[in-house]
Amino acid sequence: MISSSPATGILDRLGKASSAEEFFSLLGVEYDPKIVNVARLHILKRMGQYLAQEKFAGAAEPEIRTRCKAMLERAYGDFVASSPIDERVFKVLKDAVSDSKKAAAFVPLSELK
């Protein structure tokens, strides 16, 4: 577990976290282990997408922590209400949808040897 040194900011501590559970612990977010076990990477990826939209420059540490907590709660909520397949945060899942929209290749029986 990462120490809670006041000199280390929450973003640094999150960057060093080694598990999804550690993110939840650092930010004090309650979670259902069954949901995290199924969607841990998806939740963290979605949180990363939310973090990428944020501007933290000049923000005080308590505000940064509060905003990070809200983003993790929002990302977690996305997967409480939906599934990783429905949310499609990873490229491989997005591509699976676009590939299925392509016309299926047709091979007539007469072409088979």
Swiss-Prot record:
InterPro entries: NifW
Gene for this chain: nifW
Membrane spanning stretches: none
Similarity annotation: Belongs to the NifW family.
Keyword Hydrolase assigned: no
Protein name as catalogued: Nitrogenase-stabilizing/protective protein NifW
Function of the molecule: May protect the nitrogenase Fe-Mo protein from oxidative damage.
Description of how the protein assembles with itself and partners: Homotrimer; associates with NifD.
Keywords per UniProt: Nitrogen fixation
Species of provenance: Bradyrhizobium diazoefficiens (strain JCM 10833 / BCRC 13528 / IAM 13628 / NBRC 14792 / USDA 110)
GO terms classed as biological process: nitrogen fixation
